Amino acid sequence: MEVKLWNDKREREMYENFAELYAIIKATEKLEKAYIRDLISPSEYETECQKLIVHFKTLSASLKDMVPNIERFAETYKMDCSAAVYRLVTSGVPATVEHRAAASASTSSSASVVAECVQNFITSMDSLKLNMVAVDQVYPLLSDLSASLNKLSILPPDFEGKIKMKEWLLRLSKMGASDELTEQQARQLHFDLESSYNSFMAALPNAGN
Amino acid sequence: MAPPPAKMQEIHQFLSSALTQRGPSALPYAENTKSLIRQHLLNLISSYTSLDPKTATFTHNDGRSVILLQADGTIPMPFQGVSYNIPVVIWLLESYPQYPPCVYVNPTRDMIIKRPHSNVSPSGLVSLPYLQNWIYPSSNLVDLASHLSAAFSRDPPLYSQRRPPPQPSPSIGSGYSRPLPPRQTDDAAEVYKKNAINRIVEMVHGDIVLMRSAREVETEGLLSLQSDLKRREEEINNGFKEMVIEKETLEQQLQVIAMNTDVLGSWIRENQGKAKDLLVDLDVDDSFECIDSLSKQMLECTALDLAIEDVVYSMDKSFRDGSLPFDQYLRNVRLLSREQFFHRATAEKVREIQMDAQVASIAARLHS
């Protein structure tokens, strides 16, 4: 006597749904592999992936009572589909969307650092114009400017502004707090700040836009 | 007069380093007597500041050379109201202090040992009742020096070599001039002999030192060669043991193989006749048959599952090679996976039923 997989209509419907879930997970695994191996274009991947994710969410919602844990389901039927499970259960969005979001986050933080650099440049130059030339007045401003320049990853390590600010900080650290820059030194520092600022603006991407 | 503290400190350091030497240059005294030897020498130098402790090479009568401690210098000899200094060497032999030291009168170039002397031999060796009656541990160097001084005072062992007197005039009494020639001759011969002996002794001593160095080098070479040979012997022994063990292992393996050969031979002899009974048109598919319907169904489901897996694998290759479009590929993967699920689920269910059946049969067997 052979064993029947189902004995009534309801049971058959359940196994039909299980089969569909199984097929979606398997297909997603193949899709992830194809995307990783660069066998399909990102747009092609994204379209197909979105479709599979939508199908998966719809089906798993209706099967919530019978399949409360997808990992258990995959384990029961001996599926080796870790990439698919991550994509469908954990991430919930295609890899292209996920990585684009990460890039956006990086861009936004970069913008705030750029604004910080500009602010520090302008503050330093204005302070010199106001004849604030004592070491304990100038040093903190240059220190902040140097720190913000170092935070910006788009600038090269040998960027003019970084080197100049480091030299000035070294020079000021050898002077006493109440010592003042000579008129010649103040003019030189202002000149260095201005040329560094111009180089900085030129180094920014899409400055013209 | 006590010696200056600096000198005593120096002597202390010298004795400490000499008596604590190790290795080939170690002094040959018994370890438990070294502190007493040190004390004797320090007491001697404290009382007789004209003596100095030294280490030097002593040559025994049988030719052996050995480095020993000695006290070298002079001992005061009061004689007729004047104090003279007699040069002596006190050798502390290996057996000291249980046995007496060896004392020599050590004349300078212009001194001659009196011949004969009651205590001093022509070669300078001193003999005293104190030395002959040496008692350990009460006898010591200070008392020895005191006895030497007293003995020498009674009978001085040395006198200066005088220049030959002017030619005797005939007018002087013949009795005075008669003994001169033999004394002169004896003195000259004695000096020459002593000088010759000293030079020979020095030459022999130098030769012995050189020979000793050469022998030491040779001995070290032989000792290192011996250690090399010993190490090589050990290696050869180890190699031999390993070969013996390997031989035993191989013999055991040979026995196992022989046994297996016998077993297989027996099987062949038993089954040789059966080959003739085999049908020519044997059907491979019917060679094995499942024991029951559940097992048959299990076999079918598993075969179908694996077949679909192979198909999907082939499709992967086709898609990778570019001969299968992506949309077709993914659609077919999904369809085949759906079908595969049914087979896999059925197999899982059959397995559960078989397990239950096994458990039931075991329980029934236990119950009966």
Swiss-Prot record, chain A:
Any one GO cellular component localisation term in the record: trans-Golgi network
Domain called VPS28 N-terminal: residue spans: 1-99
Keyword check for Transmembrane helix: no
Matches recorded under Gene3D superfamilies: 1.20.120.1130, 1.20.1440.200
Keywords: Endosome, Protein transport, Transport
Chain ranges of the VPS28 C-terminal domain: 109-205
UniProt key word Protein transport: yes
InterPro entries, per the entry: ESCRT_assembly_dom (IPR037202), Vps28 (IPR007143), VPS28_C (IPR017899), VPS28_C_sf (IPR037206), VPS28_N (IPR017898), VPS28_N_sf (IPR038358)
Localization in the cell: Endosome
Biological processes, Gene Ontology terms: endosome transport via multivesicular body sorting pathway; protein transport
Lineage: superkingdom: Eukaryota
Sequence similarity: Belongs to the VPS28 family.
Described purpose of this protein according to its UniProt entry: Component of the ESCRT-I complex (endosomal sorting complex required for transport I), a regulator of vesicular trafficking process. Required for the sorting of endocytic ubiquitinated cargos into multivesicular bodies (MVBs). Mediates the association to the ESCRT-0 complex.
Quaternary assembly: Component of the endosomal sorting required for transport complex I (ESCRT-I), composed of ELC, VPS28 and VPS37. Interacts with ELC.
Protein name: Vacuolar protein sorting-associated protein 28 homolog 1
Gene assigned in the entry: VPS28-1
Swiss-Prot record, chain B:
InterPro entries per UniProt: ESCRT-I_UEV_domain (IPR052070), ESCRT_assembly_dom (IPR037202), SB_dom (IPR017916), UBQ-conjugating_enzyme/RWD (IPR016135), UEV_N (IPR008883)
Main location: other
UniProt source species: Arabidopsis thaliana (Mouse-ear cress)
Entries under Pfam families matching the protein: UEV, Vps23_core
Domain of life: Eukaryota
Coiled coil: 234-255
Entry's family note: Belongs to the ubiquitin-conjugating enzyme family. UEV subfamily.
TM regions (residue ranges): none
Quaternary structure (record): Component of the endosomal sorting required for transport complex I (ESCRT-I), composed of ELC, VPS28 and VPS37. Interacts with FREE1. Interacts with TOL9/TOM1D.
UniProt function note: Component of the ESCRT-I complex (endosomal sorting complex required for transport I), a regulator of vesicular trafficking process. Required for the sorting of endocytic ubiquitinated cargos into multivesicular bodies (MVBs).
GO biological process, one term: protein transport
Subcellular location field: Endosome; Prevacuolar compartment
Keywords: Coiled coil, Endosome, Protein transport, Transport
Domain SB positions: 292-360
Any one GO CC term of the record: ESCRT I complex
Protein name (record): Protein ELC-like
